[in-house]
Amino acid sequence: MAVPKKRTSVSKKHIRRNIWKRKGYRAASKALSLAKSISTGHSKSFFVRQTSNKALE
């Protein structure tokens, strides 16, 4: 089983944690942006089937 030889420094831990948090923040902001563009109908890369509220006659 692999065991680290030396203790990881606090600053390195903070750097790695910030990278991990930044990835999550970017994914969340991208998802929010896509949701906004879909809800306004300005999305060019995501197709949503439009349903009409009118009853068929």
Curated annotation (Swiss-Prot):
Stated family: Belongs to the bacterial ribosomal protein bL32 family.
* Keyword field: Chloroplast, Plastid, Ribonucleoprotein, Ribosomal protein
Could you state one GO biological process linked to this protein? translation
A Pfam family assignment? Ribosomal_L32p
Stated name of the protein: Large ribosomal subunit protein bL32c
Q: Source taxonomy lineage?
A: Eukaryota, Viridiplantae, Streptophyta, Embryophyta, Tracheophyta
- Subcellular location, in the record's words? Plastid, Chloroplast
Q: Does the keyword Cytoplasm apply?
A: no
Cellular component GO terms held in the UniProt record: chloroplast; large ribosomal subunit
Which gene produces this protein?
rpl32
User: For this protein, what is any one GO molecular function term?
Assistant: structural constituent of ribosome
